[in-house]
Amino acid sequence: MNSDTVSTATAPIAIEDSFRTRVSTRTARVGVIGMGYVGLPLALLFSEQHFRVTGFDIDPRKIETLRAGGSYIYRIPHTDIEAARGRGFSATGDYAHIGEMDAVIICVPTPLSESREPDLTAICQTAQALAPNIREGQLIVLESTSYPGTTEEVLVPILEKGSALKAARGSGRADGHFYVAFSPEREDPGNDTVARRDIPKVIGGLNTTAAEFAAELYGSIFNQTVRVSTPAAAEMTKLLENIYRCVNIALVNELKLLAIRMGIDIWEVIEAAKTKPFGFHAFYPGPGLGGHCIPVDPFYLAWKARQFDFQTHFIELAGEVNASMPYHVVASLIDALNQRKKTLNGARVLVLGVAYKKDVDDLRESPSLTVIELLRNQGADVRYHDPFFPHIGRGRKYNLQMDRASLDRLDQYDCVLIITDHSDYDYAKIVKDSQLIVDTRNATKGITSEKIVRC
């Protein structure tokens, strides 16, 4: 478009029409920042719908792998990457290419600090790198989970300060503006029962035009979009979803501890309760929460609530219950060893499964890492096995530096501790070959043996 031949009054409308046309004709360029467990699947989904997609990441290893047609995520085969490359998908670490995009979607990590406060470093650094390269009429969408207000209070000021542009507010029809929305990711790794396209996409725009742009863009790859009034409402929606899960998991974890004292099988109780066709949704106990959302998100809201002189007692209590579960696991293991006249100090323990949930290659916030650290600190000789991880290196909290052990000679271990119930494990054989099993996931359901301690 030649700006010399377009009046100031009509330029924004022309930009809006151009964006809509480029989306509808699949000529829009889409940039996705963060080629991880959220960003890469999203980029591939856009590519499958024949958008021209560029993936951005600061990790050169990811860029090299993608450029070579490879995949570093278990559930994404290399053939999907190769097919995307055939449709024009590219990967880069150079933010100078941001200006070529019609829409830029930010999918970067938002962990907690050691003091359980929001760590928005990745969002801030991304925004600072993005700002000098954005252009008028672009749509910028944040997908990273954070507290209500992050989009407007953190992202937008950095983008405005680092560029000569302003985020469109109000009617949004003015020169020199870009458009901003928040749309929370809803990835559920390892869940193949719901197609990604069938997961409704929640959208909150900074103004009506931004919301419309985002709805049109996401509506081209998702079967349903759900618009809410503001980015903060969309941010709160994501937190509600995950806090709902966190609180209910904490409830069933606490009930499990009570059931153990009462000599009741909590797993049997849950299976019976879920036969009720209304008013009950089954949640299951475990060794603790893991992943990039459920253990983290409640504390984002709790932190923000304090700015409003509000204490989220219920949420924080649920977080404390879930955070205590690795300690319960270790205590149960110690008791099981003591019953066999053994001590944890010097015991050989094999941790079976270290991913945060079954059948995924993701270690983030996994309770297994805390359990391993606790066992080591009490003198246990700890090994692990997980089909997805040949090595555990330095993480955000722990530097375990362990290589995967073999499943041969399980009888050499004083205890096999089941933390993650991967589907590929032959649990009957594992029980048969082991001296003692401590099962935190009910993975040995249906197997009767005095070797098994369920906790």
Regions found by a protein language model. Give the residues of each.
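Structural/interface elements that position substrates and couple domains in central-metabolism enzymes
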Residues: 2-455
